Amino acid sequence: MVNTDNKENEPPNMEKAHMDSSNALYRVQRPLQRRPLQELSIELVKPSQTITVKKSKKSTNSSSYFAQLHAASGQNPPPSVHSSHKQPSKARSPNPLLSMR
């Protein structure tokens, strides 16, 4: 009878210990989950700004690299591609204005 009492008493004690530990872990995990999200959002914003600056500075390097890719693929060189991209963007700006009027 003593053995059965011990066995019956052990599972609730173990469950209570698990409940306490899970609550403690849950309490610890919540702030840990919140903090990295804020830090990550800040970290993700900063590199994007530095990358845009790098792109503007290295535009000649990237264009030469793309020129090699376009030459290899047999498409038009990048200057004509860039000019064609600029023209539609100018044509697109009046279109929304006309459609809104």
UniProtKB/Swiss-Prot annotation:
Organism: Schizosaccharomyces pombe (strain 972 / ATCC 24843)
Keywords: Cytoplasm, Meiosis, Nucleus
Protein name as annotated: Protein mes1
GO cellular component: cytosol; nucleus
Keyword rRNA processing: no
Stated induction or repression of this protein's expression: Preferentially expressed under nitrogen starvation conditions.
Compositional bias per record (Basic and acidic residues), positions renumbered to this chain: 1-19
Any further remark recorded for this protein: Expression of the full-length mes1 protein requires the presence of the mei2 protein.
Signal peptide (from-to): none
Principal location listed in the UniProt entry: cytoplasm
Localization of this protein: Cytoplasm; Nucleus
Quaternary structure, from the entry: Interacts with slp1.
Known function: Specifically required for meiosis II (MII). Binds to slp1, an activator of the anapahase promoting complex/cyclcosome (APC/C), and counteracts its function in promoting proteolysis of cdc13. By suppressing the degradation of cdc13 at anaphase I this protein may help maintain a sufficient level of cdc2 kinase activity to complete MII.
An individual GO BP term: meiosis I/meiosis II transition
Molecular function terms from GO: ubiquitin ligase inhibitor activity
Domain of life from the UniProt record: Eukaryota
Start and end residues of each stretch annotated as Disordered: 1-101
